[in-house]
């Protein structure tokens, strides 16, 4: 399709868990479609180790999913973190993830890469914490923030947890918009989506 101007890798899973294949895919895309914009989405755990590669490949936009900046809150969002061959649970895993996310964002901004953070908003878990995330995002120099409503999914920890209403998300975006610009056109694309936003 001639109307495709962006190629992004977002999953399923975290693309940087298999960084070699992800980066090679970007290399191949850049080789044959040099005009397209390259975007990467990640939880940030492995990103610090590959920031130079990301910059060298001309990946201009990176999204980091940041659902908390406080480990006490993050431990209620993430059941475990697998890092350097070990599994960490609870506060230990949360601390590692948040430290790596912060390092990712700082290093990406040092390379002048556009950084967006995605925050999945979960009532009674991190919703009241979102303004603090936005304030920290401003301090990091994040370019854009996307507040995403959590959708309960069967057989997951939040399957019986309500998601935020559209009004709650809209109010949140208005409340924190003075910290960092808010993305409002997200269509929650599948990882294998192809086409325009209006086709999502």
Listing of model-derived features with the role each one plays in the protein:
Residues 12, 120-121, 191:
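Short, well-ordered beta-to-alpha junction loops that form the rim of enzyme active sites
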Residues 16-148:
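Conserved AdoMet/S-adenosylmethionine-binding subsite of the radical SAM
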Residues 3, 65-67, 171:
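Contiguous N-terminal and early-domain "leader" segments and peripheral loops that mark the onset or edge
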Residues 1-12:
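Short Fe-S-cluster ligation motifs
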Residues 131-200:
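Auxiliary Fe-S-binding modules of radical SAM enzymes
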